[in-house]
């Protein structure tokens, strides 16, 4: 994965609570195991009308949000089934960071595992961000190293992130590459095993 240290991008607001993974990526599109190609199906039932044309009333279809890479979402984002396709779809859509008051636990972990940064903010702080950025097309800068967000006016907001996941994103590690960093320790342990336990 690519390291994520700082990211500057346009923020889009999807102010809906309890957005579940089936709304993020409907089940009929989960027939592939590749991680790419899901962006066009993200929020499919909201994003398109019955005839396949874009729904002009869907928030993320507003021209002001075109090219957004930061999603300001509502409470309990990513609830529902634990499909990893949900962060795949968001990432392929173009989102690298999701900011919300709360996330479903499995979705929260799946974001980190797929190189995305989910940021939890206290509700009142999140509410200010949502109001400031709704239908504006403003940019913000997220600094994972400093654990802070700089808004379009230069205001700084700190955020917390688990040290383990922070280190993974800063270095671009996935779980396999992190395990390989311990290859010497693993081999040393294996060498100490009794011969009849070795493959």
Curated annotation (Swiss-Prot):
Q: Name one GO cellular component term.
A: 3-isopropylmalate dehydratase complex
Top enzyme class, one word, equals: lyase
Which key words tag this protein in UniProt? Answer: Amino-acid biosynthesis, Branched-chain amino acid biosynthesis, Leucine biosynthesis, Lyase
What's one GO BP annotation on this UniProt entry?
L-leucine biosynthetic process
Catalytic activity, EC: 4.2.1.33
Q: In the record, what terms sit under GO molecular function? A: 3-isopropylmalate dehydratase activity
This protein's record includes keyword Lyase: yes
Catalytic activity field: (2R,3S)-3-isopropylmalate = (2S)-2-isopropylmalate
Pathway noted in the entry: Amino-acid biosynthesis; L-leucine biosynthesis; L-leucine from 3-methyl-2-oxobutanoate: step 2/4
Q: Which residues form a coiled coil?
A: none
Q: What family name appears in the similarity comment?
A: Belongs to the LeuD family. LeuD type 1 subfamily.
What PANTHER family does its record include? 3-ISOPROPYLMALATE DEHYDRATASE SMALL SUBUNIT, 3-ISOPROPYLMALATE DEHYDRATASE SMALL SUBUNIT 2-RELATED-RELATED
Checking HAMAP family in the record gives:
LeuD_type1 (MF_01031)
How the protein assembles, per its UniProt entry?
Heterodimer of LeuC and LeuD.
Instruction: State what this protein does.
Output: Catalyzes the isomerization between 2-isopropylmalate and 3-isopropylmalate, via the formation of 2-isopropylmaleate.
Specify the protein name: 3-isopropylmalate dehydratase small subunit
Source organism per UniProt: Bacillus pumilus (strain SAFR-032)
